[in-house]
Amino acid sequence: MDKEPITSAGLESLKEELIFLKEKKRPEIVAAISEARSHGDLKENAEYHAAKEEQSHNEGRIAQINDIIARANVIDVTKLNNDGKVIFGSTVDLENLDTGEKITYKIVGRDEADLQKKLIFFQSPIGKGLIGKNKNDLVEIKTPAGVRNFEIKNVKYI
């Protein structure tokens, strides 16, 4: 079983989701299945089948989170000797030199990456392009959308 790097915050988020799925969602689904069963014939009972499908998805996500936690290699960026470099877990303020747009990314593991939340996978094109760089470095990163040019404005370890 290969260990996967994850931030402390990412692990806590997964643990919170696991508690929610087990302690709140699971009982709600069981109640919905019970209610649907009381309506009679299960073959044509859409509510029953929908609840069973939801149960399957919920149990699948619980198993997935348990697996992620079992494989987790928690990296606390605040305890690492970082020397001002972009490393796993660091938060990076960038300026897109092509558009002038300012953006902040946090470099994270596969299971916590979420582009909408500006959490980028350390092995993504942008993650790979930033790791090891320093504040004020100019970086050219090849992405699926084309080449992007950034200046690293700040690196934080929070």
Language-model features: where?
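Short hydrophobic/aromatic patches at helix-to-coil boundaries
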Residues: 3, 155-158
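N-terminal cationic and glycine-rich segments that engage phosphates or anionic surfaces
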Residues: 1-63
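Residue-level signal for pocket-adjacent positions within structured domains
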Residues: 1, 16, 37, 69-70, ...
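Generic alpha-helical hydrophobic packing signal
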Residues: 52-55, 68, 140-142, 149-151
